Amino acid sequence: MKFARILMIVLLVALGVTVATAQDAELGSEENPIQVFFVPSAEAQTLITGGEVLADALTEATGLSFEVSVPTSYAATVEAMCAAPDASMGFIPAAGYVIGNSRCGLEVEAAAVRFGWPVYWAAYIVPRDSDIYTFSDLEGRSWAYPDSGSTSGFIVPSVELQSAGITPGEEIEAGGHNQAVLAVYNGEAEFATVYFSPPLTPNFNWNYGDLPEPYDLTVDEAFVTDEGRLFVGDTRILDARSAVAEQAPDVVDAIRILRISDAIPNDTMAFGPDFPEELRTQIFEALVAFSETEAWAESALGADDGYSWTTLAPADDSNFDPVRLQFEVLGLTEEDVFAD
């Protein structure tokens, strides 16, 4: 009995030393890696695989260790970051950042740039043969959206629909932008709201106010390259439909864009409030350098079926005041956005 008691004491002391060692270890060490979180706006396994590519590149550039996670929802991502204020970084959309900043002081360091654009849009998509032709036609129609914490997929469309006096019918939380597109493609929803980035056409610069589909009369010419990129003729498609092109090669022929929203600040790279400033700068600079390499396209940030960032640029908290205003105008609370 005495021996067992002594053994138990020794084990408890050893466990305490192990826990204390992990807690006291320098941030970025193997014992205390930097926690990197990705919102599940794309397929989780794609983000995990691409996240490891990103983590390996950062480790090579900085000597720091990183641990990649894809929580089950936007809300869970914010909660995880807030739970590790001195060790977390995450790639989260504008609405998630605004909520995280209010909840626990998350701080933005940078924002995405996609093919030169510091902003993006929400797209309302419908079957190409649908009888939905105007915004008001969405009244009573079934609506698929990625996640209630998605800025382009839910927050901005909610504001616009309510402001226009439009009440959708059945609401389907699809689980991601890909899934929302597929919900329309498979006939499970009459419309969906997803992210929109402008198409790329040689010798043509798309501007806000142009048709979201300047190629709509030639959609039967759509094709998917060996790299999984979606084209219509020589125009590359970059909106959410492109992310499911390998699963649904005829997605552009099957789904059209009804309209797009006003511009939205791009997704963020944010840090916990107590994350060391010098490491933030080091990580940002390493990511910018990494974005200029071919390997970037294999990372969660740069992959076409990931976040499709071209690079990232410094961002200020005030950039997200328009999103805060939308919350205030509609009286939205954190509970409204992240309700179960």
Regions from the language model: what does each represent?
Residues 38-40, 70-75, 83-104, 112, ...:
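Beta->alpha turn/N-cap motifs
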Residues 40, 121-132, 261-278:
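A bilobed periplasmic-binding-protein/Venus flytrap-type ligand-binding module shared by bacterial periplasmic
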Residues 7-16:
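Bacterial N-terminal signal peptides
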Residues 28-53, 213-214, 219-223, 227-237, ...:
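An extracytoplasmic/periplasmic, membrane-proximal ligand-sensing/linker region
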Residues 25-95:
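Extracytoplasmic small-molecule ligand-binding "clamshell" domains
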Residues 79-137, 145, 149:
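Acidic, polar ligand-binding/catalytic clefts
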Residues 142, 148-276:
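Pocket-lining segment of extracytoplasmic ligand-binding domains
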